[in-house]
């Protein structure tokens, strides 16, 4: 078993830029694409994800330190440190159940596709770590591998069904036809879609419109996404207490993210569409006319400027929430730069209305902080024995992403009732 576990971890360590091209190439062959066409699709998607993750790296490396400086300037002192998704995923893959999740997840997805329970073929294998973490939490309280695997399957099924539900949004708003998102962190904020719809019925608030197109019409060239990124970056730099040169550098970096990300997503779609069409043709021949979606990393939604704009505004709001919310013990840190991933569905439901997205995003993040506070004890216990080190000055750790994930939390609490 240890050899198999090492193989799985070694494969995952290759990252999405290697895993996805391989998976897409094999899928292309399976769906009767010619070898050259399948290879080109896989290679194009690999190149696109290299570009996407380079832009994300630019975002994280610049926004992360700025957010941390903001926390330091406010003199915030809380007992639980948000260690971020990299540490959380390490805890997940170090668990006793980790080796079973990927093969089980693939089997479950195939069965649900064949039985027409889902329309999503999720190739985002790397993000199976979300299911793995849920399984690890349940295993920690139950000691039962069967309960742990069942918990992972429940989370996966929920993710696939939400991915099906939101796929039309991905096509209509994000201009990503045939694509769905089943990433666990993004799925967690799907209830925010209902809050957006509720907000759109509130007199006064429903008249506030600040989507990128409206902003551009109102401010002309200065309303373009490149200028919005610059202004938001400069604002965060000021709040972080940066020197003038560093403020300008942060502004330029955020402007670059706004411009480059949509272009990387276009390259991704160039590689994905042939495979998606081949899959749809193959399935229609065997199972009748039906829609099929390719499940991808939530990073593809970051191509819309309203997502990045909303996330940048929510960074200082998240820090402020941590200070003023009674009972919260989590100090936002590692996951501040992952906010763009969790708000994607909210922004899509709001049709890019940044004001509505920020309001609903604030509510959802507040909920995440409370959940992350509640699971901090078991989160900390799970981290013991792994390579995750406790930050200095903290008694416990958690994360806003998976630790504050409401789907993960509900599943964990459900199984806790019986153990």
Residue ranges, per PLM feature:
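Cytosol-/stroma-facing membrane-proximal "stalk/adaptor" domains immediately downstream
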Residues: 360-375
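Signature of multi-pass transmembrane helix bundles
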Residues: 1-55, 96-293, 320, 343, ...
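Helix-loop-helix junctions within the multi-pass membrane cores of secondary transporters/permeases
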Residues: 20-23, 63, 68-88, 200, ...
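Membrane helical hairpin/interfacial module
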Residues: 41, 45-99
């Amino acid at each position: 078993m240890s050899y198999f576990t090492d193989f799985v971890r070694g494969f995952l360590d290759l990252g999405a830029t290697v895993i996805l091209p391989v998976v897409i190439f094999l899928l292309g062959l399976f769906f009767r694409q010619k070898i050259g066409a399948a290879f080109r699709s896989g290679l194009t998607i690999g190149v696109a994800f290299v570009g996407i993750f380079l832009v994300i790296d630019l975002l994280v490396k610049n926004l992360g330190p700025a957010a941390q400086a903001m926390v330091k300037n406010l003199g915030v002192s809380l007992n639980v440190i948000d260690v971020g998704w990299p540490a959380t995923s390490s805890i997940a893959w170090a668990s006793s159940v980790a080796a079973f999740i990927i093969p089980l997840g693939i089997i479950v997805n195939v069965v649900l596709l064949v039985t027409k329970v889902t329309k999503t073929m999720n190739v985002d294998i790397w993000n199976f770590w979300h299911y793995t973490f849920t399984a690890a939490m349940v295993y920690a309280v139950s000691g039962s591998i069967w309960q742990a695997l069942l918990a992972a399957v429940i989370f996966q099924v929920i993710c696939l069904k939400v991915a099906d539900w939101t796929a039309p949004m991905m096509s209509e708003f994000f201009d990503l036809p045939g694509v769905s998102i089943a990433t666990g962190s993004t799925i967690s904020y799907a209830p925010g879609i209902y809050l957006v719809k509720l907000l759109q019925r509130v007199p006064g608030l429903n008249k506030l419109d600040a989507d990128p197109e409206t902003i551009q019409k109102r401010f002309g060239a200065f309303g373009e996404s490149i200028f919005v990124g610059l202004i938001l970056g400069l604002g965060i730099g000021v709040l972080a207490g940066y020197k003038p040169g560093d403020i300008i550098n942060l502004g330029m970096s955020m402007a670059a993210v706004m411009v480059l990300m949509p272009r990387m997503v276009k390259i991704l779609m160039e590689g994905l569409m042939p495979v998606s069409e081949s899959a749809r043709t193959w399935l229609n021949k065997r199972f009748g006319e039906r829609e099929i979606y390719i499940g991808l990393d939530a990073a593809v939604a970051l191509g819309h400027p309203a997502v990045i704009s909303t996330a940048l505004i929510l960074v200082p709001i998240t820090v402020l929430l941590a200070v003023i919310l009674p009972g919260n013990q989590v100090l936002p840190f590692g996951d501040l730069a992952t906010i763009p991933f969790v708000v994607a569905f909210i922004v899509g439901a709001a049709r890019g209305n940044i004001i509505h997205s920020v309001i609903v995003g604030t509510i959802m993040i507040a909920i995440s902080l409370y959940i992350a506070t509640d699971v901090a004890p078991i989160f900390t216990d799970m981290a013991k024995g792994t390579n995750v080190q406790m930050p200095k000055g903290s008694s416990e750790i958690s994360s806003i992403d998976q630790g504050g994930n409401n789907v993960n939390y509900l599943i964990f609490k459900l199984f806790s009732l019986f153990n």
